[in-house]
From Swiss-Prot:
Disulfide bonds: none annotated. Keywords: Ribonucleoprotein, Ribosomal protein. This is Small ribosomal subunit protein bS21. Residues 39-68 are annotated as: Disordered. Belongs to the bacterial ribosomal protein bS21 family. InterPro entries: Ribosomal_bS21, Ribosomal_bS21_sf. It comes from Orientia tsutsugamushi (strain Boryong).
Length: 68
């Protein structure tokens, strides 16, 4: 559960920090994905693509670290 303190009735700042926390925890993405039924076959393909993207990103980060 996400907690956001509201100091001195500053609701605008609290809303901004809530949005940032929700984006970091991928709440918006999970809400979007659960809007419609996703068949298991499509879910497997999506998860595999996400995994490949994550691994590609990690490899690129390692290469950059080795070059420096």
């Amino acid at each position: 559960m996400i907690h956001v303190p509201v100091n001195a009735n500053n609701s605008d700042l609290a809303i901004r920090s809530l949005k940032k926390k929700m984006q970091r925890e991928l709440v918006f993405r999970s809400m979007k994905m659960s809007r419609f039924y996703e068949p298991p076959s499509v879910k497997r393909v999506r998860k595999k693509q996400e995994s490949e993207r994550r691994h590609r990103k990690e490899r690129a980060m390692r290469r950059r670290m080795m070059e420096e």
